[in-house]
Amino acid sequence: MPLLGFAQAGAGGFFDDGGFPVGKGWDEIAFPAVSDEHAYALEISGDSMLPAYRRGDVIIVSPAAPIRRGDRVVVKTRDGEVMVKELARKTARSVELQSLNAAHADRTLPLRDVLWMARIVWASQ
């Protein structure tokens, strides 16, 4: 399964417009439990996702998995920002995202500003 450091995820060239991994710079880890051939791993860096995810934790992201309210998701904006949040609500016009860390603000984004959103299906905690 492709693996990328979370800090690198905002840089260009690692994802296509659908949120699928592309390009060079990806490492690999063995993870047989996910059936989505497009799933990939991100290694957490920093403390912005505490207490849910710690530095060094690995999350498995599935671009093909259906997303429901309450799911933890990776979101990439058209500005290139990549974030991990909990999906609070999605409408035809906007997406409301709840932060995992109380020190960071919740976000409401116009749907047109979201390039892609993919569900986190597993975490190494």
Residue ranges of each PLM-predicted region?
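Short, positionally conserved secondary-structure boundary motifs
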Residues: 1-55, 94, 122-124
